[in-house]
């Protein structure tokens, strides 16, 4: 038995939230990764085991100890399945675009009536109501918006900062998501 044994987490596949799911799974929570029909996009991220593109070490690293289910959220039947899955969960992890969950009838207002005890963790780059909420985002833009790159690189700040490696912006957000759940 581990610290989070007995907790069920539903994670909507996204590289922005996957590390939070990994941390919860590694602590013993049952994490169910919801993937689109073509699979989590990170399944195609390098590096690959023996250069085989169907064996992504990146995907394996971020999804250890997770279960997986494929749902086509463009269909009503799979949207119902998602709502039923979330209704049985303790925690929902997602980083969906602002209006996506409302379109699926899976926003907090709907989900909280299905499961009043649900902990809904929405890892969004600029929140849900900020004027920048709909802007595209990458790990690099998150880091730049937060300021850490200016402390990376050289003492001479007339030189450009050095980009950190390894999805540091996503990891920082996921650490805070993980701590918020605990």
Give the ranges of each region predicted by the language model.
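N-terminal helix-loop segment corresponding to the beta1-alpha1 unit
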Residues: 1-182
